[in-house]
């Protein structure tokens, strides 16, 4: 059964909308764990639009599961992550004007830089993942660089319907098997919700799904603990 990583960025979004102290994502991480989250995911963006530096250190000290830090491959983030020492880092592309991450990291065309970057993280015993599109050339480069994991971008799958969605699902399935064959652990995320998650969760070699927006949206009606528990139930039913 795939594990569930709960992204709590949207809790911080509500707080930052008023530049105040609540809701506190650290408190909500505790509720996510009570609901069965296997890890807590946070994205420390360069512009600090939601998660703040104080959040990451408090989360590292207080959560009982694992901490997945999403970040851009910048020198600032390298320094922060080597000080924080999260359980693992997921490298993502980042654009200032985007609402959310729009696509996968271009590992293939940045191999030299990313290899040095990944080696630096791993020298601090941090496992490293690449958030990439389901494409074999990106998977190959991820393996050659030395990433421990990949996270397959499911945003396109989530935005399609019918036969088009089926075709994209097959691409994700094929990519996941290919990645496992070359020694990578496979995660997936982006756009997954209570309606579309089961087909991704049922992929045999899927390690973990990272889900945020849909869980936080559901939590407005039923509370975060229950929202996480409901998602865990869906993931476990194949």
From Swiss-Prot:
Residues engaged in binding 3-amino-2-oxopropyl phosphate: 7, 18, 191, 212-213
UniProt GO BP: pyridoxine biosynthetic process
Record field: catalytic activity: 3-amino-2-oxopropyl phosphate + 1-deoxy-D-xylulose 5-phosphate = pyridoxine 5'-phosphate + phosphate + 2 H2O + H(+)
Residues bound to 1-deoxy-D-xylulose 5-phosphate: 9-10, 45, 50, 100
TM helices/strands, residue ranges: none
Pathway(s) per entry: Cofactor biosynthesis; pyridoxine 5'-phosphate biosynthesis; pyridoxine 5'-phosphate from D-erythrose 4-phosphate: step 5/5
Protein family membership: Belongs to the PNP synthase family.
Name of protein: Pyridoxine 5'-phosphate synthase
Protein source organism: Prochlorococcus marinus subsp. pastoris (strain CCMP1986 / NIES-2087 / MED4)
Encoding gene, per UniProt annotation: pdxJ
